[in-house]
Amino acid sequence: MAVLHLVVGCAVIALNLAAFASGGIAWYRDRPSVHFWYLLRAAQAAVFLQVMLGGLLVFTNHEPDDSLHYLYGILPLVVSLIAEGARAGAAERELGDVDFEALPADSQQSLALAIVRREMGIMAVSCGVILFLALRAAGTSTAF
């Protein structure tokens, strides 16, 4: 089980690095990226699986050398949930008091792209934070 936890941990690092880079580049270029959203969801699934495996290891009396490993292991899930909450409010913040249906089609499209860009930026930053936390978790594990 510890080996699986290590392998999934490496996947968490790789997937969040890829999502962070992909989302950051797409955000910078001001172009929506379908590829980013698939990477993001895979990274989030890996984080969830990693936390579950870590919980199983705790319940089977495996302990890391450093107790900070628990904090660095759980925080990525917390960051992911907070980022999803922030993403959910991105459309509301972008729209403000504007009546979307009353806007002309080209303005609707521009506003929709602005919402997607804001959501992508929020989630890309969260992947960067999770990447940092996962690297710290790896550094406090017994595997290294």
Predicted regions and their residues:
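Membrane-interfacial, low-structure loops and terminal tails that flank and connect transmembrane helices
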Residues: 94-114
